[in-house]
Amino acid sequence: AQKEVKPKANPMKKTTVKGSQFETPLLEFSGACAGCGETPYIKLLTQLFGDRMQISNATGCSSIWGASSPSTPYTKNHDGFGPAWSNSLFEDAAEHGMGMHMGAKQIRERASHTLKQLLDLDVDAKIKETADAWFADYENGEKSRALSDDLIAALSDYSGDNAEAKKYIESILDLKDYLMKRSSWIIGGDGWAYDIGYGGLDHVLASGEDINVFVLDTEIYSNTGGQASKSTPLGAIAEFAAGGKPVKKKDLGLMATTYGYVYVGQIAMGANQAHTLRVIAEAEAYNGPSIIIAYAPCISHGIRGGLTISQTREKDAVETGYWHLWNFDPRKAEKGENPFTLTSKPPTRDYREFLEKEVRYTSLKRKYDQEKVDEIYAKSAEAAKERYENYIRLSEAKYGDEE
C-alpha cells in the first residue's frame, strides 16, 4: 500500500530555497565522508532536474561515492525516472559528456523531423494539438516531461487507418524516451576541471551547445590522496606542495567568461542558499553552455571541528573573503546590461581567521618560523584581495547601453 501512495505536488516554486526541499532527492545514502561538501550540491541538482538528468561523471571522489559497485546512490522517483549516470576518466569526461549530449540531441531531432512529416498528413486533432504544444516549448526543459507524455499518449491512441501515419507514429514511439529534453550535466572535481580534463572542458564550453558543467571545487585532488591542483590556493600545504603552494589559484570561472556566451557561476551553498539556487536554475535554463564552480570543504583540509561544520566553513570562506560569490549571464549582455554580477560583500572578518582553522594552512608552522608563516599568510590574503577587487571592477564596468 505504501508504494501506491504518490508524493504530494510541490506547493511552492522549486527554484526557491524552501520550495526545493519539497522535491524528492534522487541521491541517497552515498557513502561519502560524513559531512562531505560535495554531496549536498548533487542532491540539490537531483531535486531540481533529477527525473530528466543525464550525467557524465569524471573519475574522482564524486565517481567513487556516486557508483561504488554493486550499488549507486542515484535513485528514481515514484514514476520510475531518475538520473542516467555514466562515468569516464579524468582525461576525457568532458568529451564523454559531450558525446552523450550530442547523441541524445540527434535522436530527438530525428523524432522531431518524423513528427513534422506526420503532421503533413491528415491526423487526429489531438495529435496535432499535442504536437504543436511540444514544438512550441521544444527547448523548455521544465515543461518537456509533461508535454512529451501528452504527445506519447495521443500517438498511442491513434486509431486511424492511414498506413503512412502508422509508420511515422511507430517510428516516433520507438524514440519516445528521447522526446523529452534532457538536462545534460558533466560533473567532476577541480583535479579534472582545472588540470587533467581542462582541454576537453574548454572544448565543451567553446562548442556553444546547451550543456551544463558542475565543478566540485575541493581545491585539491581529494580521491587520490590530497595532491595540489591548479585550484589549490597560494600557501596551502598538499602533496607536491609540501612547503605550501607557491603560486596563486587559477581563476577557472573568470577564464570561462572570456567566451562571452558561457553562463558562469561561483557558489557556496552554506554561505548563500538563495544565490546557489538562483545560479543553478539560471545555468540550466540558459540555452547554451554553462559552468558552475562550487566550493566544497573536504576531509583533506583538516578542518578544526571536522566536517560536521562543512556548511559553516562555506559561510566562513565567503565572510573572510577567501571565496567569492558571483555569476556571469550572457543574456544580460544581449539586453545591453553588465553580465557580471558580484554577490559577495566586502569581507567582514579577518582572512587569517579562516586559514587558522584548517590544518592545510596551520601545518606551515611546523615547517617555518612565525615570520615566514606570516609572510605566506599575507601573500595568500593579498591574492584573495586582488581577485575580489578585480571582480568589483568587472561588476561596476559600464556595458552596452549603460555607457
Predicted regions and their residues:
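Flanking helices and flexible, charged tails adjoining ferredoxin-like Fe-S electron-transfer domains
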Residues: 1-47, 53-54, 63, 71, ...
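C-terminal extensions of enzymes
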Residues: 38, 44-52, 58, 67, ...
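Generic, well-ordered alpha-helical scaffold segments in large soluble proteins
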Residues: 39, 44, 48, 52, ...
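N-terminal leader/propeptide and maturation segments of large enzyme subunits in energy/redox metabolism
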Residues: 90-164, 365
